[in-house]
Amino acid sequence: MKKKLEDYMDWPKIEDLEYAECRNVEDVLGAVAVEDGILFRCFFPDADKVLIKIKGKSRTVIMKKMDNCGYFAALTAGKKIPEYTYQVQYKTGKMEIIDSYTADHYVDAMDEVMFANGEHDRIYDKLGAHPGQVAGYAGTWFAVWAPNAVSVSVVGDFNNWDGRLHPMRRLESGIYELFVPEVGDGDIYKYEVHGYDGKTVMKADPYGFYAEKRPASASIVWSIDEYEWQDADWLKKRKQTNWKKEPMVIYEMHLGSFKKPMGGGFYTYRELAEKTADYCKKMGYTHVELMPVMEHPLDASWGYQVIGYYAPTSRYGTPEDFMYFVDHLHQAGIGVILDWVPAHFPKDEHGLGRFDGTCLYEHLDKRQGEHPHWGTLIYNYGRPQVANYLIANALFWLEQYHADGLRLDAVASMLYLDYGKQDGEWIANMYGGNENLEAIEFLKKLNQKIKDRRDGSLSIAEESTAWPMVTGNIEEGGLGFDFKWNMGWMNDYLEYIKTDPLFRKGRHGMITFSMVYQYSENFMLVFSHDEVVHMKGSMYQKMPGTPAQKLAGLRQSFGYMAAHPGKKLLFMGQDFGQISEWSEERGLDWNLLADGKAMASGTG
């Protein structure tokens, strides 16, 4: 018996759609071949009339409005779904639009398998927002991983932030995707996630390439493949250089407080490129190390509480502006190392925490999933898609932004399950120990991926314990880093040097002990930002004596550092004798150079 149009209506699912709670929208949207022909279905809540324009036919098909909410349907003769568009009429006008729910999938089956296995090194090419075309119509593909969500919609100014208008198609892997016509570079968006826990939250895109400037938090559609790089000579030289055998003097810097404009605010990436390159060349630095430039909501975190791992912060400009920064330094012969934070992430509602209504990126048990003294969440490195997210991100910065290396922050907190925790606040591994076995394998895999590039990229560990073989070969059980910060040397020396010379007798072993273990790792000597904040005082303030003696102590310290084996890293401002403690809220005291009070002036 021939069915009527109404017989094909799945009213419970249509109701879910109208409340933006439909898990599989392809069950009620798009065109599908049925027993009696081709069934067309669409949802335009404010439309008065919808017509189907079929390619090659002059007449349009009027769709029937099936309910008062804006669900339209039509049944036509035929066995093959034709090419078609919708002509949607509103009180304020009309528009012609393609049906996104009949388009081919952007994320294919191989992408899903590779991602599920944690082996998709370029997953950022598929997840996130990617401008493109479907059937000749320009728009943007959106894709996000939220396997436990009831439904996910993409929302933005383009649909008045109405989650009913662009519900996304769910794939078997738990990835949601959708092509949205007429959306392109510069459009802001978020994902409206109806979570497993019954809550609806607005999430920024974990794979978004650009984001609004804080305190706004939406992602921005942005193409990042159009910049024309001019650093081919640098990349060729880097590939041929063994940095373990070459001098390295690294200038650690925070872009927002290196220098400040007279009127407040920040210099742009392009402005900072000129200023940074000029200064580093003059001072003889081989590299800069940037405190995290990935998007973060809180200035006071200095970038170490990241929300947008794939987006350079919009505080200083666009992705192309940051590419220019790296490019300009490369052309000046200066390498660029990025601080990278895979150890933890913040709890901001628009971030990764409870992304789909479950602990998707973090552990469910707080004893595994939270840092109690940082108030942040810990990644579940054993989940393949989470490890893939992070490893692909590391490779992304090396590939897309030509970074010369990554300095991994807080590696010790990754390696130890009981890091910063009291008894009862952590869970032992399967062998009863405190080692995070999943994090260990994650780090080995990451470092192997970087080594496999064979392009001279470096990985550096800030690891504050005596964990063995941090820079050891992976094949021999090591973690595979190229260099490790020598925190022991730094702590011993600072404890020694702040003592008045009259009382240093019997303490000289503190400046020689480092040679006992010097060759157990590939060490990097550091006087980093961590030592000149939080009431610790500047390097100048740590020195005993009169102002002249303090400056002399600084020169002595840097001379000792230069003579000691190991690569060197110095935080900005210390090289000219910055007097005040560093703060992200103000620029360095460059006036000291002009006033003749800096160490570089020779005073003292």
Question: Could you say what each language-model-derived stretch is?
Answer:
Residues V50-I52, V152-V154, Y189:
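Short beta-strand elements bearing conserved aromatic residues within extracellular beta-rich modules
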Residues F209-K213, A232-K245, H254-E435:
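Substrate-binding/active-site clefts of carbohydrate-active enzymes
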Residues P215, H402-D404, Q422-G587, L592-L593:
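Conserved alpha/beta catalytic core and glycan-binding cleft of carbohydrate-active enzymes
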Residues F43-K49, W145-V152:
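Short proline/glycine-enriched turn/loop motifs at strand-loop junctions of beta-rich domains
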Residues M1-G37, S58-V61, M66-A146, R170-E252, ...:
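The feature marks proteins involved in alpha-glucan
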Residues D48, V150, Y285-V288, D404, ...:
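Short acidic/polar active-site loop segments enriched in Thr and Asp
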Residues G602-G604:
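Amphipathic alpha-helical
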Residues T200-V201, K259-P261, H296-D299, H344-D348, ...:
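Short catalytic/ligand-binding loop motif for oxyanion handling, primarily in non-cytosolic enzymes
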